Amino acid sequence: MKKLIILLLLINISVAYGQSSLRLGVNIDPITSWLSPKTNRIDKDGARPGISGGLMVEYYFHENYGIVTGFNLGVQGGNILYNDTVKISTGENTSVWVPAGASVAYNLSYVTIPIGLKLKTNEIGYFTYFAQLGFAPQINIGSRATSSGNGLNKDNVPKEINLLNMSYFFGGGVEYNIGGQTSLLAGIFFNNGFVDVLSNNTHKAVQNFLTLKLGVLF
């Protein structure tokens, strides 16, 4: 039964792709990310570079409008300055006390499955211009923390980070047709988080990031 369902899904994708209503692609996206505090117990202490990559799926219900989704694996994060002494869990029975005034750098790994709307122009020369907006649900699959001189050096801190994250995104860019249905893509996107990333109830922060999206659509 499972094999039959998979076969039917593949047939549906093939038919849709043959009708040019479905486009698939791959992307790799440099990221600049930061954690924005929502309490006065912590302060932002700088951004961190990151990277994301994966698959793009676009389904068009009109020549100029479509639904976009995909699957991405990426690393983002940010630096936080704690204004009071904080206990950071590094395992089942281990923890590190970080003193007030210390900065902690978080590197966070996520699986992202975005869903949004894409609006695009007709092709002008070889160029097509587009805008996108939507939501980006994320699942945390890894979290590390570093604080120089305070006992944290890329330690795993899964208990400090919430499993689920959510942001809305908007941005735009350009596609360059290199032949047939194949296009190079470049765009700039901003994600604004609205779910607390930190599991500690007294320290709240959301994840924001700026993305340079680079990809190929087929």
Question: Where are the language model's segments positioned?
Answer:
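Positively charged n-region of N-terminal signal peptides that target proteins for export
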Residues: 1-4, 19
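Sec-dependent N-terminal signal peptides
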Residues: 4-13
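Short glycine/proline- and aromatic-enriched beta-strand/turn motifs that initiate or cap beta-hairpins
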Residues: 17-56, 217
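Outer-membrane beta-barrel channels and translocator barrels
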Residues: 19, 62, 122-126, 177-181
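Residues that define the transmembrane beta-barrel architecture of outer-membrane proteins
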Residues: 20, 47-51, 107-111, 127, ...
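Residues on the lipid-exposed face of transmembrane beta-strands in outer-membrane beta-barrel proteins
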Residues: 26-30, 51-59, 71-73, 113-119, ...
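Flexible, solvent-exposed loop segments that connect beta-strands
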Residues: 35-44, 77-109, 141-162, 198-203
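Predominantly the C-terminal beta-signal and adjacent terminal strand-loop region
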Residues: 76-82, 159, 165-218
